[in-house]
């Protein structure tokens, strides 16, 4: 109902869906990072009373985690039918939300493994209302994962990088790199592969043809 406050999980769902609905969101890693990260971060920051600086730090953390996950797979998730925003977003947003919540390393690991089980979104749903909801679900999944981890819920040791974890399961040809993420904090995707901002509210792959037509 209008004027009534909702939970952080619901806020992330609604705002993430709305952010992706117009197709005017930023682009990187064959996905739309801010569409997932910002709704999750704003919802959690408001819930926990985090400062603007801490929210920005959470964004950078989430972006770096997203870049790290993306770098592990050389083949296209789209070609396999996966929507990268939906399948990578929950883990990146969970890392950001766990930072804002102040979870320790053990609880953060649980939250990330839970997020690996919350992923999903297929290309077959492109062109429908389900596609923007992929982003909303990814954002809300982060809050849900952090809530469960904080409450003592359990999950596998490594739901993301294990031989039977998410990255291996998603990999189109089983060629994913599952080595430890030793580059986090020393290699910065936010500077080497920064966000790209759209000129037009359509899929980014259409921008060059649009420019050619307009020229």
What are these regions (language model features)?
Residues 1-193:
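N-terminal core-entry segment
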Residues 185-215:
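A conserved active-site cap/scaffold subdomain adjacent to cofactor or substrate pockets
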């Amino acid at each position: 109902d209008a004027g009534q406050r909702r939970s952080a999980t619901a806020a992330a769902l609604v705002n993430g869906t709305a952010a992706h609905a117009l197709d005017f969101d930023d682009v990187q890693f064959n996905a739309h990072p801010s569409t997932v990260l910002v709704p999750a971060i704003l919802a959690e920051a408001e819930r926990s009373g985090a400062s603007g600086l801490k929210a920005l730090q959470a964004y950078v953390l989430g972006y770096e985690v997203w870049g790290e996950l993306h770098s592990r797979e050389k083949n296209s998730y789209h070609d396999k039918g996966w929507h990268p925003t939906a399948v990578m977003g929950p883990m990146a947003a969970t890392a950001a939300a766990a930072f804002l919540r102040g979870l320790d390393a053990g609880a953060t690991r649980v939250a990330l493994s839970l997020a690996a089980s919350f992923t999903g979104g297929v290309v077959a749903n492109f062109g429908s209302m389900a596609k923007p909801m992929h982003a909303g679900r990814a954002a809300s999944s982060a809050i849900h994962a952090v809530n469960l981890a904080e409450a003592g819920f359990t999950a596998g040791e490594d739901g993301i990088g294990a031989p039977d974890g998410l990255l291996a399961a998603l990999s189109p040809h089983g060629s994913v790199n599952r080595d430890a993420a030793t580059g986090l904090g020393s290699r910065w995707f936010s500077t080497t592969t920064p966000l790209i901002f759209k000129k037009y509210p359509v899929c980014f792959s259409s921008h060059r043809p649009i420019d050619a037509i307009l020229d």
